[in-house]
Structure formats: C-alpha cells, structure tokens
Amino acid sequence: MIDFNNSQILFDLMDSLDHQLLLPLVEEENICLPLPINVVSKYWNIDLPMSEAIETAKQYANYNGSILIEGIESAERHGLICKIIHSSLSELKKIIDIGIPPIVILPGIPEITQHASVISGYDDNEKTIFHYIQKGNQEGEQQEGAIPQAIFDKEWSEDGRLLIILAPSNVLSSIKLENNPSERSNRLCFISERLSIQKNTSESLSSLKKAIELDQNNSAALYLLASLLNEQNSNDCVQYYEKCIKINNRFYLAYNGLGNYYLKSNQFDKSESCYGKAIEINPKRSAKIYKNRAYLREKQKKNSEAKNDLKSYLKLFPKAKDRGIIEQTIREL
C-alpha cells in the first residue's frame, strides 16, 4: 500500500513514472521480424506486415535465430529511421526521456549467444532498468522486468554496449548521439552477420573489413572478423580477437572465441587461460565453455577440475542432448 500522505514517496513514484514508456503488448514475431523491432514499430503506430517477413524468412529455412537487420530494414521501408551505436548508460536514459524506447544487445542465456531487448524505462531512485516483457499480466497490462542498473551495465558491456534506435526522422533529429560517426560501421556488422547466415563468407569478410576501416575501434567488427577467420582456421584471427579485447577487456565472446581457436590448435594452456577470463566476466553465459574447458583439462590430467567443469555444464544446460554421456564421463573421472 502506498502512503500518499508521504510527500517524498509520492515524489519518488512520480519521478519514476516520468522515466517509463508505455509500450504495446505484442506477441507476433518472426526470424525476419524480431519481437523488439515489432514492438518499437507499433509504439510509433507503424504495423510492419508479417506476410512480408514470412516471405523473406523462406531464404533462411534452416536458421533458428533472429535476423535483426531484416527487421530493421523492414521498419525503414515503412518510414522509420534507424541508428546503431555504441552507447552508454547515461545516453540510454536520455534517449528514454525523449520518448524513444531503445533496443539493446545483451548476453543470451546458456546456448543463446545474444538477445535483443527493448528497454521501457528506468528508476534512478531504485537504481533499476526496466525491460519489456512479451506477455502482459492477467488484466492485459504491460509487464516489466527490473534489473539493477549496475548489473545491466555490466552485462551490456560484454558486447560493446550496442544500442539500436528506431524512430521517426523528426524525433531522431532532436537528439545528438555520442558515437553517431560509428553508425555505418555498426550497420555493416549486422549486414555481415546476415551474409554469414546466407553462407556468403567472402562478402561478409569484405563488409567487416570495411566496417573496421570506418571505425578501427569497433570491437564488434573486430570480433566478428576474428570469428570468420577462426572458422577458416586462420591464425590471423588471433590478432583481431586481441585487438577487440584491448578495446573492451570485458568482451566475453572474444575470450571465448580465442579459447576455441587455441583449443583447436592444441594450445591448451592458452585456451584454458582465455576460457577462465571469459568465465570470470560471466560464469553463467555459456554452458559449452565448461565442456570445452573440461576436455582440455582432462587432456592435461586435471581430472578433478574437468569433473567440476562437466557438472557446471549440466547445471547450466540440464536438457543437453549429451547429458547421458557427460554423466558417464563424470562417474569415470
């Protein structure tokens, strides 16, 4: 029960509401029209045609994730302007206060690399950030997930604090962005990911190299280029992973990718070190990293540590298809 006779409580409540956006309840989504894009578009009273997304999705028949650039381009075709930037917590708050719901790229749950989330507001009194939740409550009202600002910013930093703005041109023109010059470089990263999904590796590499030419400090571009080179078993991937980490020493995926490269090349000490740094940044982000580290530790005769890693793997990924094999390995170690 709120005590409305307490003026400070009432002031804090009103101040909190000033920083929250009322977003539409949306359930429809498609790999080419991801939920965050659909929510923000409907917020601006623009209904993106699902039929268009379904038709586009036919070329990605065997892909399970979301293709953000397809949704972004659909929104742009229907009148919205998009900016993709590396941002900050203070800038995110300014964007919300202008009335724009930002989309941020955050770490995924185990076995989902990343996910996009719509931020619906913040509360500086409680030091929380509000995430849009897909389903409303029983009364059909908007629900929000609250996360402490410090934890949000810590997790957001793992992928370079990427932020997507979708808004009408007259609204977008009213704000001055901190890293607007890097916008084209960031867009090329999203385009390159689509090209990779389409198995067009050469064009994807070209897009990433151009992205780095435009912004040599684009950690996302450096990571993606390193990943493609890693897939080709090229030693060149190491320098790009290292450049990415130098720019953002909390870039989880870069440590994990570098660890994978060293694992493939049987450089177990280096691999273990990279995995350890990734786990130190976020111990719950990936289950597979524990299985990989268990493998190399078993090779190094570190059976007790390998056993603990396999237990962590199953704890984070209880429905793993190889659960039976892993449990047997744990018993044998």
What are these regions (language model features)?
Residues 280, 298-321:
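TPR/TPR-like (Sel1-like) alpha-helical repeat modules
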Residues 224, 257, 291-292, 326-329:
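Canonical tetratricopeptide repeat
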Residues 218, 251, 285-286, 320:
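Residue-level recognition of tetratricopeptide repeat
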Residues 211, 243-244, 277-279, 312-313:
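Canonical positions in the second alpha-helix
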Residues 1-2, 122-214, 220:
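Noncatalytic regulatory segments and standalone regulatory/sensor domains
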Residues 1-63, 108, 125, 185-194, ...:
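Active-site-adjacent structural segments surrounding the nucleophilic cysteine of cysteine proteases
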Residues 76, 81-132:
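Active-site-adjacent substructure of cysteine-protease-like catalytic cores
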Residues 214, 247, 281-282, 316:
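Structural marker of alpha-solenoid helical repeat scaffolds
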